[in-house]
């Protein structure tokens, strides 16, 4: 059995929790009738053991065993730090 572990990239939209954050995954879907590409976002709750990710960071996350009711993803790495303006 060769199960591939899912890994995705997204932006951190909330980091107010301890050892957790929310990441928004954006994808483009073609409208079934009109053919226009529409942006769809999915929010995932991610486990962050060391509180590395901050608001606005681009992060890579992967699927894991369920950690809580809503958390089943863990942080792999911070791809790009947020620019503080």
Swiss-Prot record:
Keywords: Ribonucleoprotein, Ribosomal protein, RNA-binding, rRNA-binding. PROSITE patterns: RIBOSOMAL_S17 (PS00056). One of its GO terms (molecular function) is structural constituent of ribosome. GO terms for cellular component: cytosolic small ribosomal subunit. GO terms for biological process: translation. The keyword RNA-binding applies. It comes from the Bacteria. NCBIfam families: PRK05610.1, uS17_bact. Part of the 30S ribosomal subunit. One of the primary rRNA binding proteins, it binds specifically to the 5'-end of 16S ribosomal RNA. PANTHER family: 40S RIBOSOMAL PROTEIN S11 FAMILY MEMBER, SMALL RIBOSOMAL SUBUNIT PROTEIN US17M. This is Small ribosomal subunit protein uS17. The gene is rpsQ.
